[in-house]
Amino acid sequence: MKTVEILFWIGLFIVFYTYVGYGIILFLLVKIKEIFSKNENNKGVRDLPEVTLLIAAYNEESVVDSKMTNCLELDYPTELLKIVWVTDGSDDNTNTLLANYQRADVLFEPARGGKTAAVNRAMDYIKSPIVVLTDANTYLNKEAIMEIVTLFNDPKVGCVAGEKRVLSKDKDTASAGGEGLYWMYESKLKDLDSRLYSAVGAAGELYAVRRELYKHMEKSVLLDDFIQSMQIAMR
């Protein structure tokens, strides 16, 4: 066999493994593990902890009202759910609109230092044991907070990643549909990763951490969600 043919088949194998093979092997490993492991169900009703929903936003006036409506509809005791916005550098009507909502705590500094710096600063203010981080243009299922909290019943869990679903509009159904399929597959892989040992990263649209495990990151960090979740998984 010629060198070119060998390289071709090696390259083809790498592509196949990356997009399909890894998922197949992961699925088989999870099934083998579950056959020989005890099924521990940590879900159930326990004393609910105080939770802070943290939203880092910059000039998000177009979604403030819809986001707050979504937050206020979440199925979690009002007295245990704090809603904190950090809006550093915003110079539109974001802060003005948020002032209309009594439950919205707003942290604001005129200078914009980036999302990572804003989240770091907000974490110094937050005291609740569980912090759920989400984007201003991300809308949560009503049960999302409750589902996340139940996973923290397991003391070995330090970070929980949410599942992203893309909502499509008529004008871009094809492109959004393709993105939606990608995220469905990505979410399935993360689910299998967590069942085998641990997921290898969380999407910034929705993830939660134990406050005590959060570590400040350098302002220059761009993938703050990935870095933070990986640091927790490594402990």
Set out the residue ranges of the language-model regions.
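A conserved acidic beta->alpha catalytic loop
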Residues: 52, 70, 86-95, 111-112, ...
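Short, acidic, metal-binding catalytic loop of nucleotide-sugar glycosyltransferases
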Residues: 69-80
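Short aromatic/hydrophobic "clamp" motif used to bind/position activated sugar donors
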Residues: 131
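Cell-envelope/extracellular polymer assembly enzymes that use nucleotide-activated donors
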Residues: 49-52, 82, 227
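Conserved donor NDP-sugar-binding/catalytic core segment of glycosyltransferases
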Residues: 142-177
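N-terminal membrane-anchoring/stem segments of glycan-assembly enzymes
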Residues: 1-43
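Glycine-rich, basic loop-to-helix element that forms the pyrophosphate-binding segment
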Residues: 109-126, 146, 184, 227
